[in-house]
Amino acid sequence: MANLKEIRDRIKSVKNTRKITEAMRLVAAAKVRRAQEQVLRSRPFADRLARLLENLQARMRFEDADAPLLEQRAVQTITLMAVTGDRGLCGGYNSNIIKRTEKRFAELQRQGYKVALVLIGRKAISYFTNRNYPIQATFTGLEQVPTADEAGSIASEIFAEFLSETSDRVEIIFTKFINLVSCKPVVQTLLPLDPQGIAEADDEIFRLTTKEGRLSVEAGSAPENSQPALPSDIVFEQSPDQLLNALLPLYLQNQLLRSLQESAASELASRMTAMNNASDNAKELAKTLTLDYNKARQAAITQEILEVVGGSAAAGA
């Protein structure tokens, strides 16, 4: 059995580690709430924009519209975007996206398409660069709560590639946020665009509460969108082509922003869960080590008593 000093040092190290993981859990929990609040704040605009585009498309159903972002052409080259984080310590969040990207890349290549990667996050960049995958562009340093400006800069890149016909289709692989313990990597086509609505009816929101003196998170339903329907007799001064070409890039940016927001919330939730598990494991390990320490200390005391008794017996003999 290890000596008492070694066990004491291990107990101290485990307790210090638990303090760090607990702090990281609390920070991630607070940021999850911020990420969700941002999604909810942007939802009315996203929903109204989608309805406006649907209205335009319905009116243009029998017209020959010139909207490049809606152009369906023969697909030869596909841009595959992957969204990971810049940091680790978030469970399987990054590895799940990387595995899904590798699988999708192989599927598209087997179908005869030429595939290039657009990577968001240092984890994806490091992994695919070291394995010599064809990389078209990379982006790092995004905020924990993604902004419209960040989404706009990325959207401009893929927008230019699509318009120049360097890429015939753009797909994005990101982590869809389901709840605090469940996130799912999904594949979504960004270009050509097909506006069909944005808001998810079953979204959950989370509130920070205290339970038994410890910070916890409780789930609740997202508030329903109360935006009124667009009037059917609305009149547009500009031509449908002009409106579409002005609104579609905005819609693309919004779709990309939504994907980044979902990914950010998923990463934070995964980190919070991972740090919570690490804190619990550290607590159990500290208990086990404390028990070992007490046993070792008791054994040492017993041994000392036996030595004293034995010495006394030998002296009296």
From Swiss-Prot:
GO molecular function: ATP binding; proton-transporting ATP synthase activity, rotational mechanism
Protein origin, superkingdom: Bacteria
Gene Ontology cellular-component annotations: plasma membrane-derived thylakoid membrane; proton-transporting ATP synthase complex
Location within or outside the cell: Cellular thylakoid membrane
Name used for this protein in its record: ATP synthase gamma chain
Keyword Ribosomal protein carried by entry: no
HAMAP family referenced in this protein's UniProt entry, alphabetically: ATP_synth_gamma_bact
Species this protein is from: Synechococcus sp. (strain CC9311)
Topology term for the membrane: Peripheral membrane protein
Origin organism lineage: Bacteria, Bacillati, Cyanobacteriota, Cyanophyceae, Synechococcales
Function, in words: Produces ATP from ADP in the presence of a proton gradient across the membrane. The gamma chain is believed to be important in regulating ATPase activity and the flow of protons through the CF(0) complex.
UniProt subunit comment: F-type ATPases have 2 components, CF(1) - the catalytic core - and CF(0) - the membrane proton channel. CF(1) has five subunits: alpha(3), beta(3), gamma(1), delta(1), epsilon(1). CF(0) has three main subunits: a, b and c.
InterPro entries xref list: ATP_synth_F1_ATPase_gsu (IPR035968), ATP_synth_F1_gsu (IPR000131)
Presence of keyword Membrane: yes
